[in-house]
Regions:
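Charge-rich, low-complexity N-terminal segments
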Residues: 2-153
Length: 153
C-alpha cells in the first residue's frame, strides 16, 4: 500500500484500505510467565510437580479496528497472565483436592487435558479467539517450555 492510500481514501474504513495485517507479540522479547504443572500419567519425571519459566509468543491476523490495530496487546497479555504463578493440572488429578484442602485453590488451573506445552498453546489460542473482536481471522500461539521444547498451534 502506498503512503497516500490512507490519506486519499478518507471515506473508507481502515480495514477496507489496509486489508488483513498480522500483529506479532513477543517475537524478540517473549511474554514470560512462571507456572507449575505435572503430567499425571507420564512414566517419567514429568509426573512429579515442577515448574517452568514459559516464554510465549503470539501472532494475531485480522483487519484493523477503528482504533487502528489488529488487537489490543493488553488483551493478549491479560489472557496469558491468568496462568502466571499458577499451577496447571488435568481434571481428576489428586492435587486438585490437595490445593483445595490447603486453601490454595485460587492458584490452581484445572484443564480438561494434560497441561503440556502443546495443550497450553491450543487453549490459549482458543481463549484468544473467543475474546477477540470478529475482525480477527487467525491466532497462533507458541509456548516455549524449555530451550529445547516449543509448541505452536
Amino acid at each position: 500500500m502506498t503512503r497516500s492510500a490512507l490519506r486519499e481514501d478518507q471515506d473508507s474504513t481502515l480495514s477496507e484500505v489496509a486489508g488483513e495485517r498480522t500483529l506479532r507479540i513477543g517475537e524478540d522479547n517473549p511474554i514470560r510467565i512462571s507456572s507449575g504443572h505435572r503430567i499425571l500419567h507420564h512414566d517419567g519425571k514429568c509426573s512429579r510437580p515442577h515448574g517452568h519459566n514459559y516464554e510465549i509468543t503470539v501472532e494475531v491476523t485480522g483487519t484493523l479496528t477503528d482504533d487502528g490495530w489488529v488487537v489490543d496487546k493488553g488483551d493478549v497479555t491479560d489472557i496469558i497472565d491468568e496462568w502466571d504463578h499458577r499451577f496447571l493440572v488435568q481434571a481428576g488429578d489428586p492435587l486438585v483436592e490437595a490445593f483445595e484442602t490447603s486453601g490454595d485453590s485460587d492458584s490452581l488451573i484445572v484443564l480438561d487435558h494434560p497441561p503440556t506445552a502443546e495443550v497450553m498453546s491450543v487453549i490459549l489460542e482458543e481463549r484468544m479467539l473467543e475474546s477477540f473482536p470478529d475482525t480477527v481471522s487467525n491466532v497462533s500461539v507458541a509456548v516455549r517450555e524449555t530451550g529445547e521444547l516449543c509448541a505452536t498451534y
